[in-house]
Curated annotation (Swiss-Prot):
Gene name linked to the record: coa3a
Compartments, as annotated in UniProt: Mitochondrion inner membrane
Record keyword Membrane present: yes
Organism of this sequence: Danio rerio (Zebrafish)
Protein name: Cytochrome c oxidase assembly factor 3 homolog, mitochondrial
Topological type in the membrane: Single-pass membrane protein
Leader peptide range in chain numbering: none
Keywords: Membrane, Mitochondrion, Mitochondrion inner membrane, Transmembrane, Transmembrane helix
Topology Mitochondrial matrix: residue spans: 1-50
Pfam families (alphabetical): Coa3_cc
Amino acid sequence: MSSQGEPKPEAQFAKRIDPTKEALTKEQLQFIRQVEMAQWKKKTDKLRGRNVATGLAIGAVVLGIYGYTFYSVSQEKIMDEIDEEAKVRVPKTGAN
């Protein structure tokens, strides 16, 4: 008696084949294509998710830089106004 966990030596499932050495039937080739397409679809779904996450992260960084640029430019205008007010208040000398 053989235990249930041990595969029988005559079992044909999960047998490794080399398509370059053995001639494959039409059904075997179709099955190989079907499995490869399923694996490809699974991988592309993962990759698409990663690409979306990366795109959103890059977009967030770009928008952050863009927003900070506007913020810093608006601060420069305030500093220019403060400098102009300081020039008006300082008495003029011959060196100015």
